[in-house]
Curated annotation (Swiss-Prot):
Gene name, Swiss-Prot/TrEMBL: GATA
Protein name in UniProt: Glutamyl-tRNA(Gln) amidotransferase subunit A, chloroplastic/mitochondrial
Taxonomic lineage from the root: Eukaryota, Viridiplantae, Streptophyta, Embryophyta, Tracheophyta
Known partners and oligomeric status: Subunit of the heterotrimeric GatCAB amidotransferase (AdT) complex, composed of A, B and C subunits.
This enzyme's EC code(s): 6.3.5.7
InterPro entries: Amidase (IPR000120), Amidase_CS (IPR020556), Amidase_dom (IPR023631), AS_sf (IPR036928), GatA (IPR004412)
Length: 541
């Protein structure tokens, strides 16, 4: 039973310290809507909740539900290419076993995620299917264990339907960097889904699965969520175990999740979050039941966000951000004001320094982490006459261009002659970024910004211009540097494609305050009466 509204308000801390670097936000913009589709718009509904209710009532079987999703996956996968590996036969067997247990009256059969089909980004280990990291060097690799996040989903009753595509080892923003295939965007198959978790975002957007897992090192959950019109959550660093996640940059990597609604995303977080003895960086803080704290639309008052203070980051609405994106974000801010919150502009002076610092730090950590891929212990091995040649051949043939480039960049930054000039200075910038966010979040309950400078762009548009691609991460990397939680919810559209292109609103909170973000995101989502984030691909099929 959701808590009453007053309890909901009390769950959000309100700090009102004076700030010289703020001004009242004003916006006349309305939320940007997309051209009409054949599916009726309305508040996002929970697929997880409806699946659970239908199983408990006997209205549907797990086999029926699985068949529905697999049918849609088979229909759309040739054009989307969201999955590197599909475990359809295994999913059908698990669904049949669940039905058998329900029929036999086993009380624990219908777990919180019973019958829910989940896609898993292919840099998370799965013992019963290949785990490649999107790289040729791990082609055919089958781990001996499941990642903790995957195991917890399965223990809650979820059915893993397959491994989703990604930029190789998470290094990219378009999913064009995969060694196996290019994933497309369900809103327009000539456009990228974002990255590096593009396969996970595309799969949820196209309803190939109910929810999915991704990873976020510098925006790899949030930017694809914005591009594909789904909800994406990057938890606080340490909130979810990284055990079984192929390491890219260990001080930045976070396991995140995607859903078609905030409720679904909150439900997944409640399952996967929590301390894990296999990950020394995982937090021992108590994990709330995030979904139970969400208030349904019919229980909301006219001003459900009254008393909430929101800061809109000035630096995210300037040069380099598309006008249509700015209009959508301003429209979303105006909507939040109509719900009762106070929205003011706030400046984060160190914001622009985050991007170069991030790429130095991430590449430096990657140069160490990826040294484990040597062609000996696991993965693909290339023939050679001696050990050094084996290392060279395996890495030269097994790793892609972007990965090699970042390894070289990181090795350079860590070298004796340049450590102080690059790596040490980047760490100092990271401290400034953390302090900047800390100061802002002492004055505001939540900060907001766009999740990406533009909507989804054409496949091939930026793949040969790495600087332009890196610049696209400027709105997300600071959150990783600071280790903060952030939620992306669809908030509007810009022109493009057959039915417009979605834009995501990024909500940023204090450490371990995911509950605040989810409550505000849920209220925002539920009150968008005239927007539907169902891609035309589904309306046609």
């Amino acid at each position: 039973m959701p808590p009453p509204l007053q309890a909901h308000r009390l769950l959000i801390s309100h700090r009102r310290l004076p700030s010289p670097a703020r001004r009242r936000f004003t916006a006349a913009s309305s939320l940007q809507s997309a051209p009409a589709t054949t599916l009726a718009p309305g508040p996002a509904t929970s697929s997880i909740l409806s699946i659970r209710e239908s199983l408990l009532s006997g209205e549907r079987t797990a086999a029926d539900i699985t068949s529905e999703y697999l049918s849609r996956l088979r229909r759309t996968e040739p054009s989307l290419r969201s999955f590197i590996h599909v475990a359809d036969a295994a999913a059908e067997r698990e669904a049949e076993e669940l039905d058998r247990r329900i029929a036999s009256g086993e009380k624990d059969a219908v777990g919180p995620l019973a019958g829910v089909l989940v896609g898993v980004k292919d840099n998370l280990c799965t013992a019963n299917m290949p785990s490649t990291g999107g790289s040729r060097i791990l082609d055919g690799y089958r781990p001996a264990y499941d990642a903790t996040a995957v195991r917890r989903l399965q223990e809650a009753g979820a059915i893993v339907v397959g491994k989703t595509n990604l930029d190789e080892f998470g290094m990219g923003s378009t999913t064009e960097g995969s060694a196996f295939q290019v994933t497309t965007n369900p809103w327009d198959d000539s456009r990228v889904p974002g990255g590096s978790s593009g396969g996970s975002a595309s799969a949820v957007s196209a309803r190939q699965c109910v929810v999915s897992l991704g990873s976020d090192t510098g925006g790899s959950v949030r930017q694809p969520a914005s591009f594909c019109g789904v909800v994406g959550l990057k938890p606080t660093y340490g909130r979810v175990s990284r055990f079984g996640l192929m390491a890219y940059a260990s001080s930045l990597d976070v396991v995140g999740c995607f859903g078609s609604s905030v409720f679904d995303t909150a439900t997944i977080l409640s399952v996967v979050a929590g301390h894990d003895k296999m990950d020394s960086t995982s937090s021992s803080q108590v994990v709330p039941d995030y979904a139970s704290e969400l208030v349904s639309l019919d229980l909301l008052e006219s001003k459900p966000l009254a008393g909430l203070r929101i800061g809109i980051i000035q630096e995210t609405l300037g040069e380099g951000v598309a006008n249509g994106v700015i209009s959508s974000i301003k429209g979303a801010a105006s909507h939040l004001e109509q719900l009762g919150s106070v929205v003011e502009e706030v400046s984060l002076p160190s914001f622009s320094l985050g991007l170069p610092a991030y790429y130095i730090l991430a590449s430096s950590e990657a140069s160490s982490n990826l040294s484990r891929y040597d062609g000996i212990r696991y993965g693909r091995q290339f023939s050679a006459d001696d050990l050094n040649e084996l290392y060279g051949e395996s890495r030269a043939n097994g790793l892609g261009h972007e990965v090699k480039m970042r390894i070289l960049m990181g090795t350079y930054a860590l070298s004796a002659g340049y450590y102080d000039a690059y790596y040490k200075r980047a760490q100092q910038v990271r401290t400034l970024v953390k302090e900047s966010f800390k100061d802002a979040l002492e004055r505001y309950d939540i900060l907001i910004s766009p999740a990406a400078p533009s909507a989804a762009y054409k496949i091939g548009e930026k793949i040969n211009d790495p600087l332009a691609m890196y610049a696209g991460d400027i709105l997300t990397v600071n959150v990783n540097l600071a280790g903060l939680p952030a939620l992306v919810v669809p908030c509007g559209f810009v022109e493009g494609g057959p039915a417009g292109l979605p834009v995501g609103l990024q909500l940023i909170g204090s450490p371990f305050c995911e509950g605040n973000l989810l409550r505000v995101g849920h209220i925002f989502e539920q009150t968008l009466q005239n927007l539907s984030f169902v891609p035309p691909l589904l309306a046609e099929s």
